[in-house]
């Protein structure tokens, strides 16, 4: 899975205090499952799809707007279909907030993600894993 590390980099680019204190951002993969048709191509390739929830926990944070903006911008580039499925406002990013003192919050955001993996036989044995069209990009903040 390569999207979690990329989203972390994008959040750090948008919120510099996460670079200064990286312990304030925790990312965990939860509720994961793999799907596949099991079909084998003429070249022997098989593919599968990671489906999971990436939970971003921002600790002792002073506002929710910046993380949500960074995540929505990232999703627009890396999970466009997810954003398009939200049209009508009936779905979105689940989140929870623990309100602390002095205007600080702990913010937990659940982000449903997918990543396709193609597994092809490698010359000389072994397997090559490719994540097509899953080269995550960090949009300009």
Q: Predicted segment positions?
A:
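Long, contiguous binding/interaction regions
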Residues: 1-49, 57-141
